[in-house]
Amino acid sequence: MAQAGSENKEPWNEETRAKFEGKSRSEYLDPCQEAAQRSIRCLHRNQGDRTMCSDYFEAYRECKKQWIERRREQKRKAGALF
C-alpha cells in the first residue's frame, strides 16, 4: 500500500487562518491542497488504481475534517452565527 508520508501538519493554524481571513472572497484557499496533490500524483503513478492510493485519500479526508472542525471552533469562539 502507498505511504501517505509522515507529515502531520495541522491544516488550520495561525498562518492558515491569517491567509484565509486576508484573502478576497473570490479567492480560493485550501490548506489541504498538498494532500490533494499527493492523492492525484499517486493515481497517476498507479494508472488510476484507487486501491493503491487509499492512504493518500484517507490523509486528505482527515486533513479536511480537521480543517472544517477548526474553522467551526474559530467561528464559535468569535461568536459568528454562520
Curated annotation (Swiss-Prot):
Motif stretch (Cx9C motif 1): 32-42
**Record domain CHCH: where:** 29-71
Taken from the UniProt record, the cysteine pairs bridged by disulfide bonds within this chain are C32-C63, C42-C53
Primary location recorded for the protein, binned into one broad class: mitochondrion
Its GO biological process annotations read:
mitochondrial respiratory chain complex assembly
For this chain, the family text in UniProt reads:
Belongs to the COX23 family.
As for what it does, the entry says: Required for the assembly of cytochrome c oxidase.
- Tell me what this protein is called: Cytochrome c oxidase-assembly factor cox-23, mitochondrial
The root-end lineage is: Eukaryota, Fungi, Dikarya, Ascomycota, Pezizomycotina
